[in-house]
């Protein structure tokens, strides 16, 4: 394809932290280019999932192609690819950016630069994108445009002297953003090979069309009837239709080099078209795929069990359907003595886990119990083999374990200066080791290496509370480190409850065991017999509490009378309690399983 036909195409995405006004700016751009009529406009046009709307976050990538008549009289084709902003979805962001030549960096004029936008901006710069700074929310009384510019230059290190000040809410200066896109972001450059290469930016499942893939054609063209090959799996599929989003779905005869659009090829599930993969023609394939593709690895695991055992087949079906849209979700059947049948699910992070659980409950009307999330540990066995363990209940016997290694992450925290002491204290409590501190204007960048297990539970919430919401976090996995880890088991009346097992650092084992026993004591309802709650490491009991039995007053009917009569009744009651204790099962309520999650939140 010639460079002339590409000259008026601009592919760009928006990098922004959660709540900095990315989706609102996208709405304004769509409106200005006439993508939707005024009556069809609704807030957050591109966030199509109700959870995305409610939480004000973007989970899946979306795209929209818009014609724009610029001031120089030429019509440009703008392809805007929306990206998720949360740290859990950083791989999806890198794929969206790989499909662009430029990016708008949106910064809130009142809040300044946040860690997540820094991480994504570095990704954009590494991939050679032209980054255009945009300072949003200038209509706020607390907006400080000069400070925001200074922060962009100090923290990210790009020139912000010609940053565009806008208010996406009122629509002020949005036209200037479009002009900046046209004049500052370069058009796509033709590749040297003519063979088809298309990057899959995202895939989702449609009940009528099968998998719809959002693609950026790097070279060549795709048209209906072509036979495509997915390069990582080697499978072939016939194209049904191609087109673009305007943001409604519009069918086109072909997608050419430099364009971004959708492809349907009756693929049955998103694993057949993984994000970041390359599409090529089956009859005339490209010599090599586009760089950067990687399998998504779940980092956090939790058990999901239906409250009602009859819902198990429905849960399986719901997870199968969700997986069609969510390539990062992994699950396998699991049975637990305490909870019955369910699934062990793998997620990218805590936000991903919450969203999946919320979608299962809301869209499929399921009542679910989730166990405490755990990370994947590496276990070196005495025979020299290494296993990955995502469930504490599956830890091999102590005499077979040489060492346990936990995942370590590198966390970058950006915070205003006054909260630095609180944040360092929090990181030290979480067994972190400091890597460095950089002072960048009024912001401070603190780098720590932390055990992922400490971050998974409540680190993000605690970070927000010690910094009054101002600190922001970005993290990535670095390595596995060996340490003195033990498994704490909970025994109720001598029976081990596998769903409550935890893996903890030996120095924390006693404290966590005591806290867990105390918490369980509050949550397990009183029975007709004493319930012993114990925490154990191996065969050693490290903590114990007892839920006292309820007693019926068996002497109430004895008015006076011989003491032996009373003794007989009390003995009979005691005998009954003893028998009950032998056969009695203790029902453990749902809250007790969540106790593990809330232990640190006291």
From Swiss-Prot:
Residues 7-189 form the tr-type G domain. InterPro entries: EF-4, EFG_III/V, EFG_V-like, EFTu-like_2, G_TR_CS, LepA_C_sf, LepA_CTD, LepA_IV. It catalyses: GTP + H2O = GDP + phosphate + H(+). One of its GO terms (cellular component) is plasma membrane. Its main location: membrane. Keywords: Cell inner membrane, Cell membrane, GTP-binding, Hydrolase, Membrane, Nucleotide-binding, Protein biosynthesis. It is a peripheral membrane protein. Coiled coil: none annotated. The keyword Transcription regulation does not apply. Pfam families: EFG_C (PF00679), GTP_EFTU (PF00009), GTP_EFTU_D2 (PF03144), LepA_C (PF06421). GTP binds at residues 19-24, 136-139. It is found in: Cell inner membrane. GO terms for biological process: positive regulation of translation. HAMAP family: LepA. Required for accurate and efficient protein synthesis under certain stress conditions. May act as a fidelity factor of the translation reaction, by catalyzing a one-codon backward translocation of tRNAs on improperly translocated ribosomes. Back-translocation proceeds from a post-translocation (POST) complex to a pre-translocation (PRE) complex, thus giving elongation factor G a second chance to translocate the tRNAs correctly. Binds to ribosomes in a GTP-dependent manner. Belongs to the TRAFAC class translation factor GTPase superfamily. Classic translation factor GTPase family. LepA subfamily. This is Elongation factor 4. The lineage of its organism: Bacteria, Pseudomonadati, Pseudomonadota, Gammaproteobacteria, Lysobacterales.
């Amino acid at each position: 394809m010639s460079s002339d036909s590409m000259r008026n195409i601009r592919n760009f995405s928006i990098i922004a932290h959660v709540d900095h006004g990315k989706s609102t700016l996208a709405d304004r751009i769509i409106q200005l280019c006439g993508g939707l009529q005024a009556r069809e406009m609704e807030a957050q046009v591109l966030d199509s999932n109700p959870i995305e709307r409610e939480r004000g976050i973007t989970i899946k990538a979306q795209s929209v192609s818009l014609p724009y008549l610029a001031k120089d009289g030429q019509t440009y084709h703008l392809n805007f690819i929306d990206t998720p902003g949360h740290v859990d979805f950083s791989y999806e962001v890198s794929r969206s950016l790989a499909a662009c030549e430029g990016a708008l960096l949106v910064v809130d004029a009142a809040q300044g630069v946040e860690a997540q936008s820094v991480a994504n901006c570095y990704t954009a710069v590494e991939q050679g994108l032209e980054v255009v700074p945009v300072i949003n929310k200038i209509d706020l009384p607390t907006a400080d445009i000069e400070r925001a510019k200074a922060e962009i230059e100090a923290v990210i290190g790009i020139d912000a002297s010609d940053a565009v000040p806008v208010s996406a809410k009122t629509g002020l200066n949005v036209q200037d953003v479009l002009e900046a896109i046209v004049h500052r972001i370069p058009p796509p450059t033709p590749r040297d090979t003519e063979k088809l290469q298309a990057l899959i930016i995202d895939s989702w499942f449609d009940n009528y069309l099968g998998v719809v893939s959002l693609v950026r054609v790097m070279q060549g063209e795709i048209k209906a009837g072509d036979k495509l090959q997915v390069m990582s799996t080697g499978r072939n599929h016939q194209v049904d239709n191609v087109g673009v989003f305007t943001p409604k779905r519009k069918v086109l005869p072909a997608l050419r080099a430099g364009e971004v659009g959708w492809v349907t090829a009756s693929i049955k599930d998103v694993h057949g078209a993984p994000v970041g993969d390359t599409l090529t023609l089956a009859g005339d394939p490209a010599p090599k795929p586009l760089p950067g593709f990687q399998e998504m690895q779940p980092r956090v695991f939790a058990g999901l069990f239906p409250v009602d055992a009859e819902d198990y087949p429905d849960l399986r079906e719901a997870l199968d359907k969700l997986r069609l849209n969510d390539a990062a979700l992994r699950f396998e059947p699991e049975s637990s003595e305490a909870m019955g049948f369910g699934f062990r699910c793998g997620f990218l992070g805590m936000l991903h886990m919450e969203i999946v659980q919320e979608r299962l409950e809301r869209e499929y009307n399921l009542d679910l119990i989730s166990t405490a999330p755990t990370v994947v540990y590496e276990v070196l066995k005495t025979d020299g083999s290494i296993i990955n363990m995502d469930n504490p209940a599956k830890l091999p016997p102590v005499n077979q374990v040489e060492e346990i290694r936990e995942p370590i992450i590198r966390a970058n925290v950006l915070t205003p200066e006054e909260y630095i002491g609180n944040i360092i204290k929090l990181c030290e409590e979480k067994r972190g080791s400091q890597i460095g501190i950089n002072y960048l204007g009024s912001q401070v960048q603190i780098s720590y290496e932390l055990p992922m297990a400490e971050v998974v539970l409540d680190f993000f919430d605690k970070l927000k509370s010690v910094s009054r919401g101002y600190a922001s976090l970005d993290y990535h996995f670095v390595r596995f480190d060996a340490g003195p880890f033990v498994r704490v088991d909970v025994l109720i009346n001598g029976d081990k409850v596998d769903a409550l097992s935890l893996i903890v650092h030996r120095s924390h084992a006693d404290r966590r065991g005591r806290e867990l026993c105390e918490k369980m004591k509050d949550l397990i309802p009183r029975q007709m017999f004493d319930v012993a709650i114990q925490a154990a490491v191996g065969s050693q009991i490290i903590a114990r509490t007892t839920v006292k039995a309820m007693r019926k007053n068996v002497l109430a009917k004895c008015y006076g009378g011989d003491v032996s009569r009373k003794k007989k009744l009390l003995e009979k009651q005691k005998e009954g309690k003893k028998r009950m204790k032998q056969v009695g099962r203790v029902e453990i309520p749902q809250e007790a399983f969540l106790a593990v999650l809330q232990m640190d939140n006291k």
